[in-house]
């Protein structure tokens, strides 16, 4: 869809600018995805509620609708960011694996984010809604619980 291509083009333009300032470091790629996702799909739960009030709870609404309306919540941002990383992977800019992870914490709620794993197994979290981009093993305790059950053994070492 046109909306996705526009956001991807914005990302590539930002990458060119960032490469002139910061070089080709890998972290700047993740930072660019983080920033373009936030800019292209600002977090706005109230606007999302207004946009979806006329839809039945089981109705699927396309992501490009939220991009066009410039409003999303964590799941929309995670989907867009993962799409951008997959596109970068397909075009040869990165070579790790990308997923959208989510969980629910009792009495707190659910949340979704992007997980990127490098070929050597280093895990990065990109979470525009919670304002975080960085390594899983460097996350402070006040952050969301991003670890998968199999990550816990590795993180305790």
Residue ranges and their predicted role:
Residues 2-64:
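Secondary-structure boundary elements
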Residues 5-14, 29, 33-39, 112, ...:
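Generic low-polarity alpha-helical segments
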Residues 29, 33, 69-85:
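Active-site nucleophilic cysteine motif
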Residues 64-69, 112-115:
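Functionally constrained cores in energy, signaling, and assembly domains
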